[in-house]
């Protein structure tokens, strides 16, 4: 008998459109597998209302919210639409950014007692916050580019002291980032103190916590991992960016890969670099208690060859140009089998958790 799978996408997020593209790729894989009854659920970008769709398309069909059935969640009873219990067996969330990768949806599904593809609450929440994630990774002796972080309140209290720290601790140029946002949105490179204030103000539009890092000339290496306690680390790939300062949002989604953006899979690395990248990816995945999947991004400094972990994505992109699935495919795991494996990991993780908590006996 087929399992009932809910594919959740969209979301109140700056990465809404990317989520829709990722969902379409996964939807096609699920159709090809023919193992699941698929319930696509679209989260409206403005209202956050959940709607049940018949299918997923790319480009998305116009959404008529006046006629689409709304999805409601009743803890202890199930997920309903049109007064019918959908009897969902597993959920595959592909909501990028806020509410999707920060532990929010994962928390809701844990309350609902439904298996969920990907990381749990803690791993999602920590990984999504670049500042707290870096603090934790630093405690595990994982190399990071020098950084500082601060809250909006601290900045308005003493912005001159923070600008002084940027100059003395990091030195220019630096990268200014909102702590919680993906797809390189809201990120700028400041080459002098004259630029830093405007870039901090821009980043504060997206989040209340800011991370500032030393800017280095580096290769951008990515590494895919899947699994729970036992994990598989795939051969890393490299994103070669030729017409951009770094792999920002425009480079990722506004440019057709070609002369400007080149994907090298596998990446051309020295043996010691390859082993170090896989080791750091393993340590991050393990110590942040991740499960299901992640894409771990690294910098390799061009002059010295020094490796730095950049960030971790617990719901990586699944679009046709996304590196996560491409790296898996390069090592022999085809897209539909990747999707199937991720669903299996969700069931395994759920069973392991239920073994530890049983209030009925």
UniProtKB/Swiss-Prot annotation:
Residues reported in the UniProt entry to bind ATP: 167-222
Ligand binding (Mg(2+) 1): 297, 311
Catalytic activity: 2 D-alanine + ATP = D-alanyl-D-alanine + ADP + phosphate + H(+)
Positions of Mg(2+) 2 binding: 311, 313
Metabolic or biological pathway, per its Swiss-Prot or TrEMBL entry: Cell wall biogenesis; peptidoglycan biosynthesis
Subcellular location: Cytoplasm
Keywords for this protein: ATP-binding, Cell shape, Cell wall biogenesis/degradation, Cytoplasm, Ligase, Magnesium, Manganese, Metal-binding, Nucleotide-binding, Peptidoglycan synthesis
Coarse class of the protein's main subcellular location: cytoplasm
Cofactor binding note: Binds 2 magnesium or manganese ions per subunit.
Cofactor(s) demanded: Mg(2+); Mn(2+)
The ATP-grasp domain, residue ranges: 134-344
Biological process according to GO: cell wall organization; peptidoglycan biosynthetic process; regulation of cell shape
SUPFAM superfamilies assigned to the protein according to its UniProt record, in alphabetical order: Glutathione synthetase ATP-binding domain-like (SSF56059), PreATP-grasp domain (SSF52440)
A Pfam entry, by short name: Dala_Dala_lig_C
Name recorded for this polypeptide: D-alanine--D-alanine ligase
Species the sequence originates in: Borreliella burgdorferi (strain ZS7) (Borrelia burgdorferi)
Gene (UniProt): ddl
């Amino acid at each position: 008998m087929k399992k009932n799978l809910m594919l959740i996408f969209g979301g109140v997020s700056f990465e809404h459109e990317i989520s829709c593209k990722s969902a379409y790729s996964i939807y096609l894989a699920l159709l090809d597998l023919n193992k699941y009854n698929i319930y696509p659920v679209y989260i409206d970008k403005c209202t956050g209302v959940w709607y049940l769709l018949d299918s997923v398309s790319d480009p998305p069909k116009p959404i008529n919210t006046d006629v689409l059935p709304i999805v409601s969640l009743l803890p202890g009873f199930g997920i309903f639409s049109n007064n019918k219990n959908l009897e969902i067996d597993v959920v595959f969330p592909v909501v990028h950014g806020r509410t999707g990768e920060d532990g929010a949806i994962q928390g809701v599904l844990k309350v609902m007692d439904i298996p969920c593809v990907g990381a749990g609450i803690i791993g999602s929440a920590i990984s999504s916050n670049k500042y707290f994630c870096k603090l934790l990774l630093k405690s595990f002796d994982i190399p990071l580019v020098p950084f500082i972080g601060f809250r909006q309140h601290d900045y308005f209290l003493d912005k001159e002291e923070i600008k002084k720290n940027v100059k003395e601790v990091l030195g220019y140029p630096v990268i200014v980032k909102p702590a919680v946002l993906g797809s390189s949105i809201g990120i700028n490179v400041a080459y002098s103190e004259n630029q830093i204030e405007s870039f901090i103000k821009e980043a504060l539009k997206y989040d209340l916590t800011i991370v500032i890092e030393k800017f280095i000339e580096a290769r951008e290496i990515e590494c895919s991992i899947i699994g729970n306690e036992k994990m598989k680390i795939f051969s890393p790939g490299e994103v070669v960016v030729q017409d951009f300062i770094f792999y920002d949002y425009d480079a990722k989604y506004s440019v057709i890969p070609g002369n400007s953006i080149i994907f090298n899979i596998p990446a051309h690395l020295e043996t010691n670099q390859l082993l170090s990248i896989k080791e750091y990816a393993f340590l991050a995945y393990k110590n942040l208690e991740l499960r299901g999947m992640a894409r771990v991004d690294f910098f390799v400094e061009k002059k010295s060859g020094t490796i730095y972990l950049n960030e971790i994505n617990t719901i990586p992109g699944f679009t046709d140009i996304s590196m996560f699935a491409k790296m898996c495919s390069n090592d022999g795991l085809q897209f539909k089998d990747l999707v199937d494996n991720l669903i299996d990991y969700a069931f395994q993780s759920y069973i392991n958790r239920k073994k530890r908590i049983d209030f009925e006996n």
